[in-house]
Amino acid sequence: MLLALGNKDLEELNKINIDILKASKEFTTIEIANAIMTAFTPKDNFLNVASKYESTVEDLKSAAQVNNWCNLKTHGKIAKILEELDPNTVMILLNAIYFKGTWQKEFPQNATSTKAFYNLNEESKSVKIDMMSIKERFNYYEDKELQIVELPYTKDSMSAIIILPNKDTNINDFIKELDDEKLQKLLKRMYNEIVNLELPKFELEFSSLLNDVLIKMGMDEPFNQVTADFTGMKDLNDIYIEIVIQKTYLKVDEKGTEAADVTSVVINTKSIPIEFSMTVDRPFLFMLRNKNLPQNYEMVFMSKIEHL
């Protein structure tokens, strides 16, 4: 499991998670909640660790109980995550993140118009969407591969990061090459520029099984009935992870969203500021960033928008 999480040692990962939980208490726009619903009584050591991460522990009774928790913690945005509860299920681990932010610079509502968006693998045709538009100063960077812009929210040092690969690049190929080191370099290359930005207005809800993703990351043992080892929470080693479900709701509108370096100073005559244009009319990445968190862990939400 540690291999899947980037070879961090357990103590370091625990410290990072606690730092994130502490920081989230200061947020007014983002809420983080954890819960454990179990059909057996876990070991005391496990319960102590759960308490450290402010995770509630409840008796597992029904799918309705799980869905009610999700509905409450996401303010009604995710009302159901389970259709039914398998009789063999003995534990469910739950994590919920809820975010609602207002743009520091709101998009003018009268500037929103109907425009084309080209979905992934459907480039020959387009769908009509509401496209928001704004001309403002934002942190921005572009090169031959991509455009990246940062839109700040009004509170909590939160901002949205939007990365748009160039038209000739498949977004899935782009993501394969986008590691944390490259992302940090992109963030550092952004400068305050005048940007003519067009961004889709959208509301999405999507659900996915994460089993295959986690197994490919090296976290295969917990899913295997033979190799899974959860003796840290239960004396009898007779449990394993069956499924990991992620369900996400995302809304973006005009008001917001529910190393060597050389510096050269050149003095020249004043000129008209350069303006950049960024039209997000094809698949893109949407991230939520909190600058108060450790550098490699400041992205609290990451999503790929393929279809609108």
Question: Locations of the language-model features?
Answer:
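Extracytoplasmic/secreted cell-surface and envelope-processing proteins
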Residues: 1, 170-172, 206-208, 260, ...
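C-terminal, non-catalytic macromolecule-binding modules
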Residues: 180-183, 214
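Feature captures eukaryotic membrane-trafficking machinery centered on endolysosomal pathways
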Residues: 150-152, 273-308
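Non-catalytic, conformational "gating/processing" segments within enzyme and secreted inhibitor domains
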Residues: 13-168, 188-271, 275
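Primarily short, surface-exposed interaction patches in extracytoplasmic proteins
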Residues: 1-8, 49
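Short Gly/aromatic-enriched secondary-structure transition segments
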Residues: 2-5, 107-116, 173-181
